[in-house]
């Protein structure tokens, strides 16, 4: 099976009530470990590459590693995805270089500018059968050069307009998760009755409202590696219907432990 884009994968995930794992990769060991696990579990997977990984490992090497995984695990549907593409040029380079899915992260831009750059990427990507993930709202934290001191929640009233004007295939939203190993600074937290610092609460109400406004549409959650399992159950309860969950930090921690 050759590399695939995410469209059919997301459709199956939404109908089946499960989410696809998207794992950041930057070397042979991580690619091997993830794809072999997916082979055992008979699970589809998205292997994603950040801007930092492209700089560290070289675009061509990473593409060839993933192509090797496709060859070794032909029964596993694999998407090669750009994570947090910062601009049109980076997305275009990945599309031209063999990626089957890209994310354009215009979340820090003014709303209209985000629409403009996202639409430009979508129009180019769709010519080549490449799927596109957009983003509304920003996550706090630092991970692979994606840095925001303060996060901003997604505004549900914007999601329908954004999707209709850009033509994106999936949408990443911000409900209070955070990038990186060190999720929140003390001044971003509150203290409970025992004086223990507690991170900002996850905004399940936003997730619920977005799901109502975008029925049958793939919703993506970044910064999800530290979300407790009981919260995952709550996400489903509130109609999350998440089609994609991004995981980065645990794979790096596992590699060095």
Language model: regions and residue ranges:
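Histidine-centered catalytic micro-motifs
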Residues: 21-27, 80-85, 218-231
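Alpha/beta enzyme core
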Residues: 6-10, 28-48, 52, 61-73, ...
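Acidic-and-aromatic substrate-binding clefts and catalytic sites of carbohydrate-active enzymes
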Residues: 55
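N-terminal amphipathic alpha-helix/helix-capping segment at the start of soluble metabolic enzymes
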Residues: 1-21
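Single conserved hydrophobic/aromatic residue that forms the stacking wall/gate
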Residues: 245-257
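A glycine-rich helix N-cap at a beta->alpha junction
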Residues: 72-80
């Amino acid at each position: 099976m050759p590399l695939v884009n995410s469209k059919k994968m997301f459709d199956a995930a939404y109908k089946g009530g499960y989410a696809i794992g998207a794992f950041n990769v930057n070397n042979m060991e991580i690619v091997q470990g993830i794809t072999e696990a997916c082979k055992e579990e008979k699970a589809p997977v998205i292997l994603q590459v950040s801007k930092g990984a492209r700089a560290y490992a070289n675009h061509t090497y990473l593409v060839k590693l993933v192509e090797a995984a496709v060859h070794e695990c032909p029964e596993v549907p694999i998407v090669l995805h750009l994570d947090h593409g910062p601009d049109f040029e980076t997305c275009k380079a990945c599309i031209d270089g063999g990626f089957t899915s890209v994310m354009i992260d215009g979340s820090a831009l003014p709303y209209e500018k985000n629409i403009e750059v996202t639409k430009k990427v979508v129009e180019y990507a769709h010519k080549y059968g490449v799927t596109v993930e957009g983003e509304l709202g920003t996550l706090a934290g630092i991970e692979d050069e994606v840095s925001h001191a303060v996060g901003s929640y997604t505004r549900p009233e914007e999601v329908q307009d954004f999707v209709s004007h850009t033509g994106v295939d999936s949408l990443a939203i911000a409900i209070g998760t955070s990038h990186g190993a060190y999720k929140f600074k003390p001044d971003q937290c509150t203290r409970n009755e025992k004086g223990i610092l507690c991170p900002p609460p996850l905004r399940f109400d936003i997730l619920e409202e977005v799901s109502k406004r975008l029925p049958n549409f793939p919703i993506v959650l970044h910064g999800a590696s530290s979300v407790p399992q009981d919260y995952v159950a709550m996400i489903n309860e509130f109609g999350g219907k998440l089609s994609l969950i991004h995981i980065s930090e645990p794979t790096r921690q596992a590699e060095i432990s």
